[in-house]
Amino acid sequence: IDSPRLDVKQNPLYQDEELVLLDTHYYGGIKKYQWTAIPLALHGVVVLTDGKKINVVIGEDMDDPVVGVSDLLIHLAAEQMEKNGAKVVEGEALDILVGSMPMGSGKKKDEDAGEEKEKSKAYILKLLQKKYGFKEEDFMSAELEAVPAGPARNMGIDNSMIMGYGQDDRVCAYTSLMAVSYTHLTLPT
């Protein structure tokens, strides 16, 4: 079902200071400010250079880490708070923070750390290689998207509503599907 999301661009991984981010562009009608400081999950498919297809889901399992778009702390955001809702967060600021730990900084020193210039990015790439078997060049053939992490849940003390990512889009698809499924009950005219 087509729902708003953050699509990961090709060749997206970059390091800014010690922070590692994924470059994105938003898809669909979103209120950009609602996508900051919430847990996001990555979903998608990566086709490796050898042709192998890998399904990726990071952030939906309770044991998974989540990723997210950072935002300014309230006491540093005076200028930001003066902007109207459409401008509080610009689309180009919706890059996803995926890590900050430099290679070789953990308890066990990493022999691969060496003189690597972008050690945090190198560490993220090492983790992706270890868990999923893909390298930086495999991002070129990847279709990855970030969506709010977590399942849909009942809303309201009386459980009378449902709250979840894409619920407004999905409820329309459900009613359309139900309408089609009942068309066999109509008489030809």
Language-model regions: role of each:
Residues 1-78:
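A generic, well-ordered mixed alpha/beta core segment in the N-terminal half of proteins
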Residues 19-21, 141-145, 185:
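Beta-strand segments within the central parallel beta-sheet cores of soluble alpha/beta enzyme folds
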Residues 47-52, 102, 133, 180-182:
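Hydrophobic/aromatic-lined pockets within catalytic cores
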Residues 59-164:
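Soluble metallo-hydrolase cores and metallopeptidase-like ectodomains found primarily
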Residues 163-166, 181:
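Anion-binding catalytic surfaces of enzymes that hydrolyze or transfer phosphate/sulfate esters
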Residues 169-170:
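A conserved active-site cap/scaffold subdomain adjacent to cofactor or substrate pockets
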Residues 173-181:
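Alpha-helical support elements that line or immediately flank enzyme active sites
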Residues 183-189:
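Conserved small/polar residues in nucleotide/adenosyl-binding loops
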